[in-house]
């Protein structure tokens, strides 16, 4: 009756060590993502948005020439830059998480492939 179908103690200990290492690396990654500055721009680079690796908005820069374009064009330029920064920030976070977990499929909300 040895084992009772349970993994051996060595395997269990190794699994806990790996989990602790991932947890420590995740904390380090969280800190790295927080201080990252990722730039997104609109098509003509006259609107720029910077976000952290955690998608936290950091700052906005508008080229003075854009200010004479009118409200709708300015809004569209800012929106394009926001989308660009968010896309790069999200893909950076996803890549870093995959590196951290060694490719384990975690199925984190918002991190999966779009349907």
Curated annotation (Swiss-Prot):
The keyword Protein biosynthesis does not apply. The keyword Disulfide bond does not apply. Keywords: Cytoplasm, DNA-binding. Belongs to the YbaB/EbfC family. Residues 89-115 are annotated as: Disordered. This is Nucleoid-associated protein NATL1_00191. InterPro entries: YbaB-like_sf, YbaB/EbfC. Homodimer. Pfam families: YbaB_DNA_bd. GO terms for molecular function: DNA binding. It is found in: Cytoplasm, Nucleoid. GO terms for cellular component: bacterial nucleoid; cytosol. Gene3D superfamilies: Nucleoid-associated protein YbaB-like domain (3.30.1310.10). It comes from Prochlorococcus marinus (strain NATL1A). Binds to DNA and alters its conformation. May be involved in regulation of gene expression, nucleoid organization and DNA protection.
């Amino acid at each position: 009756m040895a084992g009772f179908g349970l993994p051996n103690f060595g395997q269990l200990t190794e699994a806990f060590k790996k989990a602790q290492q991932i947890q420590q690396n995740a904390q380090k990654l969280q800190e790295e993502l927080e201080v990252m500055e990722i730039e997104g721009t609109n098509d003509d680079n006259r609107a720029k948005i910077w976000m952290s690796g955690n998608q936290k908005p950091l700052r906005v820069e508008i080229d003075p020439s854009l200010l004479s374009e009118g409200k709708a064009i300015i809004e569209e330029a800012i929106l394009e830059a926001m989308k660009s920064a968010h896309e790069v920030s999200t893909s950076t976070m996803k890549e870093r998480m995959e590196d951290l977990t060694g490719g384990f499929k975690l199925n984190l909300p918002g991190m999966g492939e779009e349907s």
